[in-house]
C-alpha cells in the first residue's frame, strides 16, 4: 500500500547560512552603524538570539532575519518569535526558537483534519512524524493538498513516499 510521512524539519545548515547572511546585511545597513546589534545562532538549543540597543531596532533585526530565512528556503512560520523583548541594562534581546518536529497535539490536529475530510486513508502518529497510508496514490495526493491548504501555523514537508 502506498504511504508517505508528514514531517516538520529545518536544515540547520540553511539556518546557519541565513544567520550569516543576516549578519552581512546588518553590517552594511546605515541605520545600524555604531550600534551594538548581534544575531547569534545556538545550534544546541535550536534558537537564534537577537540583541540590540532599542526595541525598534530589534523589530528591524527580526525583519532582516526573516528576509534572509525566506531567501534560504526556510518558511517564516517555522520561527517561534516571542511577542515581548527581554531588557537587560541598555540592551534588548529576543530568543527565537526553531520549530522542529511535529508535537503530539499538532499531530492529532493533522490526523483529525484528514479523518474529517473522509479521504480513504489511514494516519498513524509515529513520534515526531505522521504516516499516511492509503490504497491509491490519488487519495494520498488529496491528503497532501488538504494538509498544505490548512493553516496550521507550522510548515510541513512530505517525504518517504512509498508505492
From Swiss-Prot:
| GO CC term (a single one) | cytosol
- Carries keyword Cytoplasm? no
- InterPro entries this protein is in? DUF520 (IPR007551), UPF0234-like_C (IPR035571), UPF0234_N (IPR035570), YajQ-like_sf (IPR036183)
Query: Nucleotide-binding as a keyword?
Result: yes
Keywords, sorted A to Z:
Nucleotide-binding
GO molecular function, one example?
nucleotide binding
What's this chain's function?
Nucleotide-binding protein.
What family does the Swiss-Prot or TrEMBL record give for this protein? Belongs to the YajQ family.
Protein known as: Nucleotide-binding protein APJL_1242
Organism of origin is Actinobacillus pleuropneumoniae serotype 3 (strain JL03)
Amino acid at each position: 500500500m502506498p504511504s508517505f510521512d508528514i514531517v516538520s524539519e529545518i536544515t540547520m545548515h540553511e539556518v546557519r547560512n541565513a544567520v550569516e547572511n543576516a549578519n552581512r546585511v546588518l553590517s552594511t545597513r546605515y541605520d545600524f552603524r555604531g550600534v551594538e546589534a548581534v544575531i547569534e545562532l545556538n545550534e544546541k538549543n535550536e534558537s537564534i538570539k537577537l540583541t540590540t540597543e532599542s526595541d525598534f531596532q530589534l523589530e528591524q533585526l527580526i525583519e532582516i532575519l526573516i528576509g534572509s530565512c525566506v531567501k534560504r528556503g526556510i518558511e517564516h512560520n517555522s520561527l517561534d518569535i516571542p511577542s515581548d523583548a527581554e531588557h537587560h541594562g541598555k540592551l534588548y534581546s529576543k530568543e527565537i526558537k526553531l520549530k522542529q518536529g511535529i508535537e503530539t497535539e499538532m499531530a492529532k490536529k493533522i490526523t483529525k483534519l484528514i479523518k474529517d475530510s473522509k479521504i480513504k486513508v489511514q494516519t498513524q502518529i509515529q513520534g515526531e512524524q505522521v504516516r499516511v497510508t492509503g490504497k491509491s496514490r490519488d487519495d494520498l495526493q488529496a491528503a497532501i493538498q488538504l494538509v498544505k491548504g490548512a493553516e496550521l501555523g507550522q510548515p510541513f514537508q512530505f517525504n518517504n513516499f512509498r508505492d
